[in-house]
Curated annotation (Swiss-Prot):
One of its GO terms (molecular function) is tRNA pseudouridine(38-40) synthase activity. The active site is at 57 (nucleophile). This is tRNA pseudouridine synthase A. It holds the Pfam family PseudoU_synth_1. Substrate binds at residue 115. Belongs to the tRNA pseudouridine synthase TruA family. It comes from Buchnera aphidicola subsp. Acyrthosiphon pisum (strain APS). Keywords: Isomerase, tRNA processing. The lineage of its organism: Bacteria, Pseudomonadati, Pseudomonadota, Gammaproteobacteria, Enterobacterales. Its EC number is 5.4.99.12. Homodimer. It catalyses: uridine(38/39/40) in tRNA = pseudouridine(38/39/40) in tRNA. InterPro entries: PsdUridine_synth_cat_dom_sf, PsdUridine_synth_TruA, PsdUridine_synth_TruA_a/b_dom, PsdUridine_synth_TruA_C, TruA/RsuA/RluB/E/F_N. The gene is truA. The keyword Electron transport does not apply.
Length: 266
């Protein structure tokens, strides 16, 4: 797109990932990217391609996804939010829109990405939140989980926590925040890093769960990190408990931040 009147927009997007085969466009299966591009293309009256901050897997949700696109269409700002939402299903929503400079890139301009994993830790399962939380009936020791989690802070080789099919050239990532806490019957894992390997968050959570049910001894996470071997780690935690909650950008872009709903315990 080389026209002089090209504009670049950033959008904040929420979605319930239960109904889609992940963010990325698929040949046959439904994807969030495809649905958003269709709706934007209708409003723009030309084909729109979007770029996201983080490509979430099938079943993963978001309240903080950020995307950008370029367009030659001259539309009101509300057309890119209210108008687009009118063409989206109820489980996807644009929550803010901002015109940005042409050098903004949803993926490459991002400084950090924050995820939240939510576990319903109760003896009986929830019918209401069946596709929104991971149910663990055995009592989790949150203090142990949080203690072990701190060994993952900083820049490390996270080979032990990457998917076997991960295509990233480097296993090194920098985790700047990793906290585990309890809120009544919910156990929450908050994690922030510069970027993540494929399944990295869910593999970390799966291993922390084994710590929480006292299946592993103290310092197991530390040893696991040093082994650099995925086969020694815990099972990948289900996607349904994972939320992309926030993407941090340089302040000069002045992007809005989506407000947490009550389920996110703010």
């Amino acid at each position: 797109m080389v026209a002089k009147n090209v504009k670049t927009f950033a959008l904040g997007v929420e979605y319930d990932g239960s109904y889609y085969h992940g963010w990325q466009r698929q040949k046959i299966l439904p994807s969030i990217q495809e649905e958003i591009e269709k709706a934007l293309s209708i409003i723009a009256n030309h084909k729109i391609d979007v770029v996201c901050a983080g490509r979430t897997d099938a079943g993963v949700h978001s309240i903080g996804q950020v995307i950008h696109f370029k367009t030659t269409a001259n539309r009101k700002k509300s057309s890119w939010s209210i108008g687009v939402n009118s063409y989206l299903s109820e489980n996807i929503s644009v929550v803010w829109v901002k015109e940005v400079t042409e050098n903004f890139h949803a993926r490459y301009s991002a400084i950090t990405r924050s995820y939240r994993y939510i576990i319903y830790n109760y003896s009986l399962r929830s019918a209401i939140f069946q596709t929104k939380l991971n149910h663990i009936y055995r009592k989790l020791n949150v203090d142990k989980m949080n203690f072990e989690a701190q060994f993952l802070l900083g820049e490390h080789d996270f080979t032990s926590f990457r998917a076997l099919g991960c295509q990233s050239h480097s296993p090194w990532r920098n985790i700047t925040k990793l906290n585990v806490f309890r809120f009544h019957n919910w156990v929450v894992v908050d994690i922030t890093a510069n970027s993540f390997l494929h399944h990295m968050v869910r593999n970390i959570v799966g291993s922390l769960i084994e710590v929480g049910i006292s299946k592993k001894k103290e310092y197991w996470i530390k040893d696991l990190l040093e082994k650099k071997d995925r086969s020694h780690a815990g099972a990948t935690a289900p996607a349904k408990g994972l939320y992309l909650v926030y993407v941090e950008y340089p302040l000069h872009f002045n992007l809005p931040r989506s407000a947490y709903t009550s389920i996110f315990f703010k």
